[in-house]
Amino acid sequence: MSDIPVSKRAARIEYAIRDVVVPATALEADGHEIIKLNIGDPIAYPGLPTPEHMIHAFQESLSRGETGYSPSYGLTELRSAISEDERAKGWSCTPDDVYVCHGVTEALQIIFTATLEEGTKVLAPGPHYPPYMAYPQLFGAQTIEYRLNADDGWRVDFDDVEAKMDENVRLLVLINPNNPTGNVAGPEEIDRLISIAEKWPNCMIIADEIYDELDFTGTQKSVASRSLTVPVFTLNGVSKVYYAPGWRIGYMALHDPTNRLGAVRDGIERLLRSRLCASTPAQMGYL
């Protein structure tokens, strides 16, 4: 009998840094030595442990029996703490603007689900984190890469961004600091990207700032703190700065300076409720 067919959506999905593990694991089982450069897991390297106070808080949460469901948008105390952190970065974030997710990757899935339709586009830096390419395909959307100039420290090529923007671009992505190049966009570059996005009324910015505290240049700034016009989804979490990628705890924070995200916010909240919640003990560890 022939195989039961897989959905076209699933068949299209590729995730290069994980997909390569399948043949590599087979080779390793055959006795070959494999040098693993595919995924940046800080826990895989000596000297980068998850902070002890976070582990203790996680364990204490388990000891107290806090293993039930949390609110779908995240623990109230954690949302409040995150909003304080974001306000310290220069914008008026409230606890209601913060949504706790199963890592930044789930936050991306929810944002894409709430904003993309057939024929829409995501404009993301090339190179970038694979989900920016993979997940939009589920919705019949397309990811277009804008150029990072290797001869100029991997800075954003703004002429290329301008040339690739159109009315179908719903999401303009800035990963800052950038993964994998390490480039840090400063305030002037952020302002220029915002000025491009604001020419297109239906365009929103994704500010992936998961590496923000690993900036050693002193130039990294919150995109939300710079935008007076364009809606911004700020993404962050525990995976990189706190060396806890396996906890799968991250968040999105919505900056809506001109009050245009009402319908999108409603869609995001519906999606969050439909998937129940993020891990309660892991949230307590983050808190």
Go through each PLM region and give its residues.
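Helix C-cap/helix->beta junction micro-motif
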Residues: L27-D30, F139, K199-P201
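N-terminal small-domain helix-loop-helix segment of the aminotransferase-like
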Residues: D3-V6, A10-G103, I110, C277
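Conserved core segment of the aminotransferase class I/II
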Residues: I55, L228-L287
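Walker B catalytic acidic pair
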Residues: E209
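Residue-level marker for buried hydrophobic side chains located in beta-strands
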Residues: N176, I205-I206
